[in-house]
């Protein structure tokens, strides 16, 4: 194992999981960082000491609405406009992950920031007229969310989804359709820098009670999104599929399902910009990354990205902390259709191990040769993985937080640190005990903070376990 060599890191804003108590919003301080040998960004933290506001290693509170700025990477030979197809995964990100390409790093950060607006704009105040919708109008969403260069994209449509549940509406939540993200298109000025017209769709993760209740529905079911060729062997998680395809007749947003809203708007934008170089980029966090993958598959399966006498429009998913979506048939079909998925994951994030905690792509064959009978029923990840490694004993819930992901992708990397990828549970416990019981770090107050945050994360994990029926 290589020796740990750490450097100080610049200050970045930190936003932890939303809707926590002030005690759970404890800052991550004294972070150290190194790079793992296998596409992994490794962070070690010593956060049991009291937070020092003046420390250059302290991360400020998430109260700031400013997005995390792109990394000041070294100058590159080619501009994005020349290599955008490779950045969108045309070669499956070969030679771009290890080491991480500065341009790819910049684009992951940019899409992550644009995705964060789906959280910052979501209104969870029951007394608000915009409850469960977006707090801002389409013209102001990116600016009000603190997005760098808010004029780079024009938001064209808000997307609403209805959890597919046969339960009476929860009190104070009369409207079951919720705002889950938006569709945007790059501006004329941005086209020059990007090298193409980029159609962007973002999806936030699970927030409301109805969405958690929808999580109780879980099994693999045929997607059947193409009426002319149902492909019963292509199966996806039923809860995600229900959220994607169900509508709400009593919703003020109309009868359209999330799927119908999206396909209609994407088709409109592609017709509007016919003749231009176009890309379709889908960015999602947690549950939202699953919807992004379903939409990407849907677009490609229906042939919406095909153009006569021209190259197909690239369809790319940037998945942050995403769970598995479907079975091996779904994975193979996505690959056949040319759908590209870059999964940004944290080795310490349990959600990325679900569904299929036990029966997954690692349990489909015997010795990597003989396919086992149940392989078609195993959940399987799609795409290429960029693995991060971060953990904070006082803010355990941060292992799944979007802005923590963005911050760590955007940090400079230094020396290497080997980590056993297959020992998730042991690694988690070892880091916890090491940080909690190291010399001089036994203050009761910080132990209480750690316990509170651990309970918060475990509650979230248990909900996901119910969702994914992992047992």
Swiss-Prot record:
Expressed in leaves and seedlings. Not detected in flowers, siliques or roots. Residues 44-71 are annotated as: Disordered. Its EC number is 3.1.1.26, 3.1.1.32. Gene3D superfamilies: alpha/beta hydrolase (3.40.50.1820). InterPro entries: AB_hydrolase_fold, Fungal_lipase-type. It is found in: Plastid, Chloroplast. Optimum pH is 7.0. Keywords: Chloroplast, Hydrolase, Lipid degradation, Lipid metabolism, Plastid, Transit peptide. The keyword Plastid applies. GO terms for biological process: defense response to fungus; jasmonic acid biosynthetic process; lipid catabolic process; negative regulation of cell growth; response to wounding. Disruption phenotype: No visible phenotype under standard growth phenotype. It comes from the Eukaryota. Induction: Induced by wounding. Induced by methyl jasmonate. One of its GO terms (cellular component) is chloroplast. Residues 1-88 form a transit peptide. The active site is at 286 (acyl-ester intermediate), 349 (charge relay system), 400 (charge relay system). GO terms for molecular function: galactolipase activity; phospholipase A1 activity. A motif (GXSXG) lies at residues 284-288. It holds the Pfam family Lipase_3. The keyword Plastid applies. Sn-1-specific phospholipase that releases free fatty acids from phosphatidylcholine. Has a higher galactolipase activity than phospholipase A1 activity when digalactosyldiacylglycerol (DGDG) is used as substrate. Catalyzes the initial step of jasmonic acid biosynthesis. Required for the biosynthesis of basal-level endogenous jasmonate in vegetative tissues. Regulates leaves growth. Not essential for jasmonate biosynthesis after wounding or upon pathogen infection. Overexpression of DGL causes a dwarf phenotype. Belongs to the AB hydrolase superfamily. Lipase family. This is Galactolipase DONGLE, chloroplastic. The gene is DGL.
């Amino acid at each position: 194992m290589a020796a740990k060599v750490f450097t100080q890191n610049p200050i970045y804003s930190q936003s932890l999981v939303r809707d926590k108590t002030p005690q759970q919003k404890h800052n991550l301080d004294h972070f150290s960082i190194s790079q793992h040998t296998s596409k992994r960004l490794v962070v070690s933290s010593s956060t049991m000491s009291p937070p020092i506001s003046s420390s250059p290693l302290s991360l400020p509170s998430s109260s700031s609405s400013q997005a995390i700025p792109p990394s000041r990477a070294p100058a590159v030979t080619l501009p994005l406009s020349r290599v955008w197809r490779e950045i969108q995964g045309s070669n499956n990100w070969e030679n771009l992950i290890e080491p991480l390409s500065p341009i790819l790093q910049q684009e992951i950060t940019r899409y992550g920031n644009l995705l964060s607006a789906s959280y910052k704009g979501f209104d969870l105040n029951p007394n608000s007229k915009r409850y469960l919708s977006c707090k801002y109008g389409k013209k102001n969403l990116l600016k009000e969310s603190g997005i760098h260069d808010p004029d780079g994209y024009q938001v064209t449509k808000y997307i609403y989804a209805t959890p597919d549940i046969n339960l009476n509406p929860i009190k104070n939540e009369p409207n079951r359709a919720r705002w889950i993200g938006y569709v945007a298109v790059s501006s004329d000025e941005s086209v020059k820098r990007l090298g193409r017209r980029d159609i962007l769709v973002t999806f936030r993760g699970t927030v409301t009670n109805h969405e958690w209740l929808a999580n109780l529905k879980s099994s693999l079911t045929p997607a059947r999104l193409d009426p002319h060729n149902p492909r019963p062997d292509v199966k996806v998680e039923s809860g995600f599929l229900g959220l994607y395809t169900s509508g709400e007749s009593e919703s003020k947003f109309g009868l359209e399902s999330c799927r119908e809203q999206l396909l209609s708007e994407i088709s409109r934008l592609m017709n509007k910009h016919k003749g231009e170089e176009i890309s379709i980029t889908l960015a999602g966090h947690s549950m939202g990354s699953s919807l992004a993958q379903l939409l990407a598959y849907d677009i490609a399966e229906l042939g919406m990205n095909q153009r006569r006498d021209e190259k197909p429009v690239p369809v790319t998913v940037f998945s942050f902390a995403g769970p598995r979506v479907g079975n091996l048939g779904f994975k193979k079909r996505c690959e056949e259709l040319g759908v590209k998925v870059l999964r940004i994951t944290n080795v310490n994030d349990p959600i990325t191990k679900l569904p299929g905690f036990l029966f997954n792509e690692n349990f489909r064959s015997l010795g990597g040769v003989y396919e086992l009978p149940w392989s078609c029923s195993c959940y399987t990840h799609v795409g290429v993985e960029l693995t991060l490694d971060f953990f904070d004993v006082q803010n355990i819930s941060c292992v799944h937080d979007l802005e923590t992901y963005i911050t760590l992708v955007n940090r400079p990397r230094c020396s290497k640190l080997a980590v056993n990828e297959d020992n998730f549970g042991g690694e988690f416990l070892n880091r916890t005990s090491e940080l909690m019981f190291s010399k001089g770090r036994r203050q009761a107050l910080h132990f209480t903070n750690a316990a509170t945050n651990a309970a918060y994360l475990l509650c979230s994990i248990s909900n996901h376990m119910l969702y994914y029926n992992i047992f």
